[in-house]
Every structure is written in C-alpha cells, then in structure tokens.
UniProtKB/Swiss-Prot annotation:
Taxonomy of the source species: Bacteria, Pseudomonadati, Pseudomonadota, Gammaproteobacteria, Pasteurellales
Positions contributing to ATP binding: 95-102
Keywords noted in UniProt: ATP-binding, Coenzyme A biosynthesis, Cytoplasm, Kinase, Nucleotide-binding, Transferase
Pathway this chain belongs to: Cofactor biosynthesis; coenzyme A biosynthesis; CoA from (R)-pantothenate: step 1/5
Protein name: Pantothenate kinase
Similarity remark: Belongs to the prokaryotic pantothenate kinase family.
Subcellular locations according to the entry: Cytoplasm
Matches recorded under HAMAP family: Pantothen_kinase_1
Catalysed reaction equations from the record: (R)-pantothenate + ATP = (R)-4'-phosphopantothenate + ADP + H(+)
GO cellular component: cytoplasm
C-alpha cells in the first residue's frame, strides 16, 4: 500500500516522494538535459530525476483521466445523437507567486505532447487576462495586481468556455513581464488542441473571490484536472526575494523594463524592497485568495527547501 497512514479525515491520498515515484511504472523518459534547460524557471535548478520521480507518474495519471474523459464524451454524444466535436482536455495549475507554476506547466506540456503519442498541447497563462496597465492605474489597482479584481474575469471565463465548446481560433492576450503590461494586438491562438494547460494564480478561485463581479460560472467549472503547487510561505518569500535579486541584475537592467529603476538599488535595498512587496502584495494575496483555493485541487504538489517536490496529495 503506497499511502501514508493518517487518522485525520481527508479527501486526499498522500504519497511521499518515493512511493509516488513507484507509480511511474514503465512510462519512458523522453526528455534530455538539453530539452529540460529551456523549461526551467528563472530561479530554478530542476533535474531529470525530478521529472522522472514526480512528473512522469503525474503524466501517467493524467493520461488515464484523458482516456476516461474521451469515453464519457463519446457516450454523451451517442446519447444526444450528435457529431462529436473536438473538445480539448483542460488542466489548470495554480499556486503562489514564485512557487514554480510555470516550470511545472512547461514540463507537463513537454511530457504530454510526447507520450503515449504525439499530441498538441497548448499552454496559456492567465496573466494575459489581467487588465491593461492603464486600466489598473485608472482603477487604482497597481498594488492589487494579481488580486481577483485585477483580472478581466468575464473575458477569461468566456475564453475557457469557448475552448470547451470546441470553437476554433480562440485568441488569448499575451502579457509581457518586461513591460508589466498586455502586449497590444498580439495573441496566442488556441485552435482545438488535444490538451490546454491553463496556468495562473486564480484558476481555482470561486465566486467568493469576485463579489463585485458576479457570475454564475467559474474557470474551475471548465477544468478537467486541477493542480496546486504548494510550499511553506517562508520558502515562497525566500524564493521571491532570490528571484527579485536575479532580475535586478538581468531583466531589470533593460531600459525598457517597467522595473528598470530597481536595477539601481544596492543589494540590501533590493532585499528590503522585495521583502516589502511580498508582505504588502504577494503574501497578502496568497493568504486571502490563493491558499484558500488549494483544497479544491485534484492534486497538490508540496515542495521542500530545494524546490523538489516532497509530498503529493491526490484527491480520492
């Protein structure tokens, strides 16, 4: 039995790293070190061992879910006596700023596009559905960026609804971390892929997070499998500050960068600034809006100090 024993009532099965790795079975590792490098986040050093131990078992599990989903679609369309449109399988990945959601999303995209057969897997981030910078400034929301009210949630819900309706050539806005803004007139086009991975802070949130923007459906209503990437807040803050310091020496040095002025800070000033941003914005958003959505996920990946995933929780 590959489960950790607990007397606590929980909707999750809990696996340690070793037991989860055993569930890989015979799934082949097709990624090389060269393939892995461009998938990693700015402040992450993830190994092929992590891919084999954590992400290959996860890819195997998701493939089982996809197979069952296709069977259910076939049954429904047979019952309705209608032709079967191509409806992508949607995976969502949520979690805090600096936890490594984007890296997890890119690794899953690479694995699921190669095994068990070649498939088209699109990756979309919800950053593109933030309001443009001018709108955030007009609404006095710059210090609330990433909070529920900073998103055009109706547009995001329409986007995922169109995907699940089998529509073609659906446009997703593109966000630039350099300019801190939506790129005008540029889009990612989703055209009936096999899988869509939707990554962002808000993909598990519900109507309680949007009291001033009521609607009857949420992003999670259209998601087939949801993942939450978790870590202790102390680690998240530490990783955020480390990433900020690296950006200060690289991306922020670009004169076109929105945060170019941070490149002129001393190291101690940069640490204080990053710590303050975490406490006043990212940490607050984590406590109020992101962390409360964790228990809605189908799978929780819990990271330790070295960014390696130590525990996996799978909804029963």
């Amino acid at each position: 039995m590959s489960l950790q024993k607990s007397n606590k009532i929980t909707p999750f099965l809990t696996f340690d790293r070793q037991k989860w790795a055993e569930l890989r079975k015979s799934v082949p590792l097709k990624l090389t070190e060269q393939d892995l490098k461009p998938l990693l986040g700015f402040n992450e050093d993830l190994s092929l061992d992590e891919v084999s131990t954590i992400y290959l078992p996860l890819a195997r599990l998701i493939n089982y879910y996809i197979e069952e989903n296709l069977k259910r679609q076939t049954v429904l369309h047979r019952f309705l006596d209608v032709a079967s449109p191509k409806v992508p399988y949607i995976i969502s990945i949520a979690g805090s700023v600096s936890v490594g959601k984007s890296t997890s999303a890119r690794i899953l995209q690479a694995l699921l596009s190669q095994w068990p057969s070649e498939r088209k897997v699109d990756l979309i981030t919800t950053d593109g559905f933030l309001y443009p910078l001018t709108t955030l400034q007009e609404k006095d929301l710059l210090k609330r960026k990433g909070f529920p009210e900073s998103y055009d949630i109706h547009r995001l819900i329409q986007f995922v609804s169109d995907i699940k309706s089998g529509k073609r050539h659906i446009q997703a806005p593109i966000y630039s971390h350099l300019t801190y803004d939506i790129i005008p007139d540029q889009y990612n086009v989703v055209d009936q892929p096999d899988i869509v991975i939707l990554e962002g802070l808000n993909v598990l949130q519900s109507g309680m997070n949007y009291p001033s923007s009521p609607h009857n459906v949420f992003v999670s209503d259209f998601v087939d499998f949801s993942i939450y990437v978790d870590a202790d807040e102390d680690l998240l803050k530490e990783w955020y500050i480390a990433r900020f310091l690296k950006f200060r020496r690289s991306a922020f040095s670009d004169p076109n960068a929105y945060f170019h002025h941070y490149s002129k800070l001393s190291e101690q000033e940069a640490i204080r600034t990053a710590s303050s941003i975490w406490d006043e914005i990212n940490g607050l958003n984590l406590k109020q809006n992101i962390l409360p959505s964790r228990e809605r996920a189908n799978l929780i990946l819990i990271k330790g100090e070295d960014h390696a995933i130590q525990t996996v929780k799978l909804r029963k």
